[in-house]
């Protein structure tokens, strides 16, 4: 081992060069500390070196020292720096393969799956395998990307493996090469270079020249990939002059002693010839050889997946990419024994990997993030400005005097913010909110930031944390060691204004969107692998429809069999393996919905940036988890559809009811609103419109704001898994039965009747009951997410139980508390988050209760959002007394509008042109402009001429029955649209001549059923009738009940119902239970399918949109379900009907 360490441990980073004699002295000094060696060392030159230099100078084969050897080359830099010698005791020849255990190696060229369809292993898999094989280090060098480097950093630290950041580039005018930055400055230059190449191209591409590389080369090591294994050696020889010219000239000029020639061998038939060619090229150009594996996957078994992803990237089958497939499976991380054998003639190339690794001192933890500081006025520091704004805001929040408790809390928070240097971050978020409100954009902070009184004083959040006793350490603590996360919701239709404000303020060089790594899910993996294996599209389509959309499905083999693909055949097994492995692989980068990173310096020197799909945006290559891992702050500028709907509803209420409302002026304790909530009449409102929430409302019976906070939080996986729901409901029925071991615990749990509902309560319990510090309590909360990993939670469990015991609490109570805390995991809802959301819950419920027309119009204008499709929202509005009118060319605006009706308590609702599928908004705008200018349209010709519509635009409107006011009937309108000229003013001389719009007598008007089917196809809903109404006679013969009949039936009776499937929901915490919403002409029905029923009727349940169901009715406390026992397919009756459906996990 020592001989290799002596040979490879030299530092190559110094610019000072030593003589061969000095070098030999250094090696002798090192050997004195290595057992098995002696001070007098002889050096044996490798076979190919002796042969290469035999003609140039005579020298002794053995025993020749460096002093005796002086190659007749003008530039001897490489001859001095290279390591061709091998050390051995005198008289005993050293054989490379005999000393494998002493060999040191770093793999410097690895593509992970973040090369996007050109790598077949996750970064952490590569790191784990390299450590298992005894490598000293590993470099992740994805192609023109650093998107995956953070994923392997923490695993490498845990395993003690040197982790090197690099990249592989393919310049347009030079051979491809691998780059490794040596320090932080070099890393910044590499990122800027890659950003330059990506910003000049469309999303996902990179274009670099060697000049670009040369401009950023300072401090960067480079290895040239001089061979192309798709060519024969003879073809490579034809390019040897070009390679020599590049290596001797531009490459040496730019990289000097930082340049290498990469040597990779993969047990090809021409490895010997390739080695000779590389040796000759290295000696001729004075560029040293460097061993690398050109790794594409961590294990040889992944070769099949690599072939698959390459085929996917090219849109071909595996059989069609023969020329682009790897020759064999040797592009994996190989054992040291294999490396020793492959490089037996050039061991210096292996030793030089240690040399490169020693020169690469940069690590990701050297990235020091600096937030923009220019928001502070001149003459003030950011912390001084933050303090001034905070105290000004406090006086505004408490105009009668800031309470002493608040003053104390503010001082604590500001001190912590100053100590952790987060003041500029808070100022940036404050500036965003200030800008939004100056533009009358509705916004509200939420999440853990609602724990902060500073955020409340700055106007970022709307919940007073002193009223709800929120925990600031849930937001920021010294022990957490990570950045705070402030989430701000903006109207989703105006959020882009806020984003562009940031780009204008900081520039695209200092601001960028956070990335989202779009990964393969089950359905997409099935389709892509199926194409790559050339499996019949019909079979793959059937498998994809039957399989789940998200994660791995243990029933996939059975689903394949159902679709006609035998999973026991070689093809079937291959398909299953590739599909299962591909799930979770990154497919491409997209932009986060709102995560934004701003920096004091250049963002592209912190991380690679590229163009987003949307013009005017930049996106960095790291996602939110990557940023958290390396401590980079981001601002979440999130889009919330309900804020858009509330803003729109406020406008309509002001215009039609002459009442100006805001979130702060809505009456806080409106009895009719709470009556509606208790009746679970909450379709379309915020957060409490889901099946589970609507089932909980009649049992919880919210009657105040804090009840809504609990309602929002309790229907979450955490409380459900921690078995907190039923105990809380029982305590709600009998509050006096709640028990508290001591007053400290009573203070924590009294507001939730002795049951921990919120994450903050779990943390406070650890503090008051077990003696945790607030920071330790937050670490406990985070450890809950990893409780399935052995050992992670045990240390907290012991500390928790012992702490409770020391405080006099019995073991049963302590174990119960721990069980409840563990149930949260990452699913427990923070009280701060629930409190912020509860404000919007109440506001949306108030608007629905008192202004149902305006509320429905606002929801329709804010789509897509929420659980329900427009058809269900409109039906719900009709049940609340709202008259809804169809789209009409002479009355509809682009958005829905309200029409006063003196004979009704609520205005009428006219649907807008935006409801017509396939009608561009620009066309709708032309129609409105023409109508406003010269009045209603008289006929089709008038519409075509004045609005300058194309024939296809007229046909789209006719199909949607939007021309009813100017045409005989729908079918006639379609016929007449065909007679219109395709351009309203293309023939000015004949403009006054109307086309022949007569309708043939044999053109029969559509039947009511056809009308409804066309309504669904063109607008997603029908105001004429419900499709099920046309099947009612047949359903009555089958003894099917209507939805309106179910509340009248007693609990436990057998029922048969039928309808259209609107929604399927299968939560991960429901133990395989699927919840389904089905609708008939009288209303909706809630169905429950247990796992065995879902499995038995899987084909129908998954693929059909119309069912007949037999089951048992549950009718308890106003909550009605049908527990399904049997499902029949009604899709034949619904053939051709395009029912809007929303499926959720």
Curated annotation (Swiss-Prot):
Catalyses: DNA(n) + a 2'-deoxyribonucleoside 5'-triphosphate = DNA(n+1) + diphosphate
Concerning InterPro entries, the annotation shows: DNA_pol3_alpha_NTPase_dom (IPR011708), DNA_pol3_finger (IPR040982), DnaE2 (IPR023073), DnaE2/DnaE/PolC (IPR004805), DNAPol_HHH (IPR029460), NA-bd_OB_tRNA (IPR004365), PHP_dom (IPR004013), Pol/His_phosphatase_N (IPR003141)
Q: Name one GO cellular component term.
A: cytoplasm
Q: Does the keyword Metal-binding apply?
A: no
Keywords carried by this UniProt record = Cytoplasm, DNA damage, DNA repair, DNA replication, DNA-directed DNA polymerase, Nucleotidyltransferase, Transferase
Subcellular location field:
Cytoplasm
Q: What is its main location?
A: cytoplasm
Tell me its family: Belongs to the DNA polymerase type-C family. DnaE2 subfamily.
Q: What does this protein do?
A: DNA polymerase involved in damage-induced mutagenesis and translesion synthesis (TLS). It is not the major replicative DNA polymerase.
- Protein's name according to its UniProt entry: Error-prone DNA polymerase
> What organism is recorded for this protein?
Rhodopirellula baltica (strain DSM 10527 / NCIMB 13988 / SH1)
């Amino acid at each position: 081992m020592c001989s290799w360490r002596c040979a490879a441990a030299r530092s190559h980073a110094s610019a000072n060069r030593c003589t061969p004699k000095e070098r030999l002295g250094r090696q002798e000094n090192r050997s004195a500390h290595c057992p098995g060696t002696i001070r007098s060392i002889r050096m044996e030159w490798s076979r190919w070196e002796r042969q290469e230099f035999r003609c140039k100078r005579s020298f002794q084969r053995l025993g020749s020292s460096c002093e005796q050897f002086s190659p007749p080359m003008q530039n001897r830099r490489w001859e001095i720096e290279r390591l061709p010698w091998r050390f051995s005791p005198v008289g005993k020849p050293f054989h490379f393969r005999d000393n494998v255990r002493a060999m040191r190696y770093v793999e410097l060229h690895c593509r992970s799956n973040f090369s996007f369809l050109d790598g077949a292993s996750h970064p952490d898999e590569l790191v784990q395998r390299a450590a298992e094989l005894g490598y000293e280090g590993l470099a992740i060098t994805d192609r023109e990307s650093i998107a995956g480097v953070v994923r392997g950093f923490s695993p490498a630290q845990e395993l003690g493996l040197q982790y090197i950041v690099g990249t592989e580039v393919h310049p347009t005018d030079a051979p491809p090469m691998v780059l490794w930055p040596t320090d932080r400055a070099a890393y910044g230059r590499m990122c800027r270079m890659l950003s330059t190449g990506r910003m000049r191209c469309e999303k996902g591409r990179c274009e670099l020249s060697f000049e670009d590389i040369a401009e950023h080369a300072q401090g960067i090591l480079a290895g040239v990939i001089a061979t192309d294994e798709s060519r024969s050696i003879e073809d490579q020889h034809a390019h040897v002059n070009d390679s020599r010219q590049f290596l001797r000239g531009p490459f040496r000029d730019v990289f000097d002693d930082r340049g290498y020639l990469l040597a990779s061998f993969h047990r090809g038939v021409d490895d010997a010839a390739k080695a000779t060619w590389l040796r000759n090229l290295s000696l001729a150009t004075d560029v040293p050889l460097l061993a690398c594996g050109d790794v594409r996957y961590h294990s040889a078994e992944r070769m099949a997946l690599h072939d698959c992803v390459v085929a996917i990237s090219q849109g071909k089958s595996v059989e069609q990419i023969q020329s682009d497939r790897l020759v064999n499976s040797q592009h994996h991380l190989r054992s040291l024994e294999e490396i020793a054998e492959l490089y037996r003639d050039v061991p210096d190339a292996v030793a030089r990997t240690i040399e490169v690794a020693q020169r690469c001192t940069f690590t990701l933890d050297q990235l020091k993030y600096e937030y923009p500081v220019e928001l502070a006025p001149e003459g003030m520091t950011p912390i001084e400005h933050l303090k001034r704004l905070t105290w000004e805001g406090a006086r505004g929040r408490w105009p009668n005097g800031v309470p002493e408790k608040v003053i104390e809390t503010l001082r604590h928070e500001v001190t912590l913010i100053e100590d952790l240097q987060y003041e500029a971050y808070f100022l940036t978020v404050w500036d965003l909110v200030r800008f939004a409100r100056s533009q009358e954009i509705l916004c509200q902070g939420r999440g853990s930031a609602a724990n902060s009184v500073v955020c409340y004083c700055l106007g970022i959040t709307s919940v007073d944390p002193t009223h709800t006793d929120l925990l600031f350490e849930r937001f920021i603590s010294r022990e957490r060691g990570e950045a705070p996360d402030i989430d701000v919701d903006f109207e989703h239709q105006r959020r882009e204004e806020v984003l562009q404000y940031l780009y204008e303020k900081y520039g695209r060089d200092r601001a960028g969107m956070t990335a989202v790594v779009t990964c393969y899910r089950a359905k997409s993996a099935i389709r892509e692998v199926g194409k790559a294996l050339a499996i019949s599209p019909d079979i793959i389509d059937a498998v994809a429809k039957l399989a789940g959309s998200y994660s791995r499905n243990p029933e996939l083999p059975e689903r394949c069999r159902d679709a006609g693909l035998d999973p026991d055949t070689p093809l079937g097994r291959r398909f299953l393996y590739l599909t299962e492995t591909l799930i979770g692989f990154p497919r491409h980068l997209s932009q986060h919905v709102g995560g934004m990173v701003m920096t004091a310096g250049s963002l592209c020197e912190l991380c690679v940036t590229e163009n987003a799909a949307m013009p005017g945006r930049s996106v960095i290559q790291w996602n939110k988890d990557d940023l958290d891992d390396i401590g980079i702050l981001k601002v979440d500028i999130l889009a919330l559809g309900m804020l858009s709907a509330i803003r729109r509803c406020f406008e309509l209420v002001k215009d039609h009811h002459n009442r100006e409302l805001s979130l702060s002026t809505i009456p806080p304790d409106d009895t009719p609103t709470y009556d509606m909530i208790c009746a679970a009449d909450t379709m379309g409102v915020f957060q409490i419109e889901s099946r589970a929430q609507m089932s909980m409302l009649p049992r919880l019976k919210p009657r105040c704001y804090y009840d809504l906070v609990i309602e929002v939080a309790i229907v979450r996986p955490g409380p459900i898994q921690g078995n907190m729901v039923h105990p809380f409901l029982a305590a709600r029925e009998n509050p006096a039965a709640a028990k508290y071991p001591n007053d400290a615990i009573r203070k924590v749990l009294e507001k939730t009747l002795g049951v921990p509902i919120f994450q903050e309560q779990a943390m406070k319990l650890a503090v008051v009951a077990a003696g945790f510090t607030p920071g330790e309590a937050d670490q406990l909360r985070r450890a809950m997410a990893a409780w399935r990993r052995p050992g992670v939670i045990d240390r907290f469990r012991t500390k928790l139980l012992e702490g409770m015991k020391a405080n006099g609490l019995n073991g049963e109570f302590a174990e119960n508390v721990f069980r409840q805390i563990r149930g949260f995991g990452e699913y427990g809802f923070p009280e701060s988050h629930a409190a912020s959301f509860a404000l919007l819950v109440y506001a949306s419920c108030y608007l629905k209760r008192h202004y149902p027309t305006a509320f429905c119009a606002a929801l329709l204008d804010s789509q897509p959002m929420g659980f329900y499709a427009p058809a269900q929202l409109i039906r719900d509005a009709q049940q609340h007394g709202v008259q809804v009118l169809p789209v009409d060319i002479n009355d509809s605006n682009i958005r829905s509008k309200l029409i006063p009706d003196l004979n009704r308590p609520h205005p009428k609702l006219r649907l807008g042109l935006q409801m017509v599928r396939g009608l561009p908004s620009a066309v709708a705008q032309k129609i409105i402009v023409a109508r406003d200018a010269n009045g209603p349209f008289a006929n089709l010709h008038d519409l075509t001429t004045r609005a300058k519509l194309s024939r296809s635009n007229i046909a789209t409107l006719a199909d949607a029955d939007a021309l009813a006011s100017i045409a005989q009937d729908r079918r006639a309108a379609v016929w007449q649209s065909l007679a219109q000229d395709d351009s309203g003013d293309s023939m000015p001389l004949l403009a006054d001549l109307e086309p022949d719009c007569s309708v043939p007598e044999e053109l029969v008007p559509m039947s009511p059923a056809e009308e409804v089917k066309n309504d669904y196809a063109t607008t997603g809903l029908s105001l004429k009738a419900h499709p099920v109404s046309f099947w009612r006679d047949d359903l009555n013969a089958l003894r099917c009940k209507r939805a309106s009949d179910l509340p009248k039936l007693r609990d436990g009776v057998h029922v048969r119902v039928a309808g259209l499937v609107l929604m399927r929901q299968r939560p991960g915490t429901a133990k395989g239970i699927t919840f389904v919403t089905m609708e008939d002409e009288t209303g909706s029905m809630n169905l429950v399918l247990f796992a065995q029923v879902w499995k038995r009727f899987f084909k129908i349940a998954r693929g059909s949109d119309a069912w007949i169901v037999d089951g048992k009715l549950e009718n308890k406390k106003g909550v009605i379900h049908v527990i399904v026992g049997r499902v029949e397919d009604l899709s034949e009756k619904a053939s051709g009907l395009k029912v809007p459906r929303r499926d959720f996990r």
